[in-house]
Amino acid sequence: MENSLGSYEKELNLKATELRLGLPGSDEPEKRATARSNKRSSPEASDEESISNGSDVTKEDNVVPPAKAQVVGWPPIRSYRKNNVQQKKEEESEGNGMYVKVSMAGAPYLRKIDLKVYKSYPELLKALENMFKCIFGEYSEREGYNGSEYAPTYEDKDGDWMLVGDVPWNMFVSSCKRLRIMKGSEAKGLGCF
């Protein structure tokens, strides 16, 4: 019975699956690990240990410690990841685009467009006309958008609503937070309507 139990334990390889409170790869018992630590132990404890092991302390000092397995989570890479993520965010904000929400009075849905795709106001307005199936007409600084019941407006960084086309294109792209296509009657206070 005992032979069959012993062979069964060998087959299970209990030693390999045993849970210990040591570093990975250290197969030595806990007592020997404490003897090799950098901390000093009391002289009585070291005498007792050498007597119980039946060996001299000098023999243990000559033994080369086993190669240590790399500890999980070392070397620390958190700062590397932080810096890497920051660089990616900066690249995305500079190169990939600037998406803004576009809403239209009376439309039950919103759209998002990338302002970096367009090079000027006429391109942007043409895209908005195609997207919402409406016509804005011609823009003039004096009269706003003529021949249309809708006026494209935008909210800048300060939270002010302005007519699209009031400022130079580059300034518009850098300051636009969202676009709204208002009815001409709503946009009277913003421009020359």
UniProtKB/Swiss-Prot annotation:
One of its GO terms (cellular component) is nucleus. One of its GO terms (biological process) is auxin-activated signaling pathway. A motif (EAR-like (transcriptional repression)) lies at residues 19-23. The keyword Lyase does not apply. Residues 16-68 are annotated as: Disordered. InterPro entries: AUX/IAA_dom (IPR033389), AUX_IAA (IPR003311), PB1-like (IPR053793). Its main location: nucleus. It is found in: Nucleus. Aux/IAA proteins are short-lived transcriptional factors that function as repressors of early auxin response genes at low auxin concentrations. Repression is thought to result from the interaction with auxin response factors (ARFs), proteins that bind to the auxin-responsive promoter element (AuxRE). Formation of heterodimers with ARF proteins may alter their ability to modulate early auxin response genes expression. This is Auxin-induced protein 22D. It comes from Vigna radiata var. radiata (Mung bean).
